[in-house]
């Protein structure tokens, strides 16, 4: 899915962001509106490698907020399908304890959308 993106002022990435879903786009708009510097999917964290050193599992958080040194992952999956993502986050925290990351669930995004009158796909 390719979503048309506005001309972001607080975006700090090298390439224009290509959001995976409308929730990510709307979160980016909120960050930008408040002037919070952000990057989109700037880093991939290796979670597991095979015996030859090939990456078996990795995780790429949606946003990085450099001034807060915080990664943000947005998930709009049904709560019952979030188990795999939570497992990846646990692995990331075990392997990279210095990395700060926050997961926003579908209900968090819905509350954000209601509060800021965002247009999110159901």
Role assignments for model-derived ranges:
Residues 1-122:
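Electrostatic, structured charged patches in enzyme active sites and in nucleic-acid/phosphate-binding
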């Amino acid at each position: 899915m390719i979503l048309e993106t506005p001309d972001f002022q607080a975006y700090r990435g090298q390439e224009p962001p290509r959001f995976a879903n409308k929730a990510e786009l709307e979160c980016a708009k909120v960050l930008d509106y408040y002037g919070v510097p952000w990057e989109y999917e700037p880093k991939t964290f290796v979670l597991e490698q095979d015996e030859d050193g090939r990456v078996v599992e990795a995780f790429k958080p949606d946003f990085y907020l450099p001034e807060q040194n915080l990664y943000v992952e947005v998930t709009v999956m049904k709560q019952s399908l979030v188990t795999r993502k939570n497992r990846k986050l646990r692995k990331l925290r075990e392997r990279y304890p210095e990395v700060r990351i926050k997961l926003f669930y579908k209900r968090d995004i819905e509350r954000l959308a209601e509060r800021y009158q965002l247009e999110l796909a159901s």
